[in-house]
Regions:
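A polyanion-binding, active-site-adjacent surface
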Residues: 1-223
């Protein structure tokens, strides 16, 4: 299987949603309002096993968005995205590599509730296509409200969803694509890097090469 935040394939290629489609949340104009709606969401089966809706966090006017797959155990418990081991690595990339504060960017996931294999929280899995489709209006509206100058997709699910492709992240990383006119830079999910050597993994160098392209696009200093 292609590398991603969890083993297995997610079927993202089956999903066909764009911001041009009718969004049930189109009249919502702030992230706080959208978060309130998301907190009561029952649009898919993930609501039955979640502890918390993990909406996203960061600067509502961020120039840069990071979009991952879905919450894990720690995120489900805290209500915050990317706060486990993968989140620690992402935070280091943002703060030590890009010389930004985590609160300067916006971090979200394709789905807002934790997908697990058995619904009991023993093992995470990629979201199913119908779960992504059900949750996608939240992400699409987040993008519309924030209006970022660039998006970094982390792993297969978010990359395949935004770019409407069946290609895997191994082929797509290192390239620049576009979603609704916004530059998109696919790269490996931090958890995949951690599972394959962490700080000593050559994948980390690949991620850093991808991030430098983002920085150049945004006009950020590289030293």
């Amino acid at each position: 299987p292609q590398p991603g935040p969890a083993a297995g394939e997610s079927g993202m290629s089956e999903v066909s949603v764009s911001s041009g489609a009718s969004n049930p949340f189109a009249d919502i104009v702030t992230l706080d309002e959208l978060k309130d709606v998301a907190s009561e969401c029952r649009r898919c089966r993930l609501c039955e096993t979640r502890k918390t809706v993990v909406f996203g966090e960061g600067n509502p006017k961020a120039r840069l968005m990071f979009i991952g797959e879905g919450p894990g155990k720690t995120e489900d418990e805290t209500g915050r995205p990317f706060v486990g081991r993968a989140g620690e690595l992402l935070t280091r990339i943002i703060e030590n590599g890009m010389h930004l504060r985590r609160e300067d960017v916006y971090i979200a996931n394709v789905v807002k509730c934790r997908p697990t294999v058995d619904g009991l929280g023993t093992r995470d899995r990629p979201p199913e296509a119908d779960e992504t489709a059900a949750c996608s209006p939240f992400l699409l509206r987040q993008i519309e409200i924030i209006k970022p100058d660039a998006i970094v997709t982390l792993g297969n699910p978010s990359t395949r969803f935004l770019l409407k492709t069946t290609e895997g992240i191994t082929k797509l990383r290192g390239t620049e694509a576009s979603f609704e006119g916004i530059p998109v830079f696919p790269t490996y999910h931090p958890s995949y890097v951690l599972r394959n050597g962490g700080d000593s993994s050559p994948l980390k160098k690949d991620v850093w090469a991808d991030i430098k392209k983002v920085m150049a696009k945004l006009g950020l200093p590289l030293n």
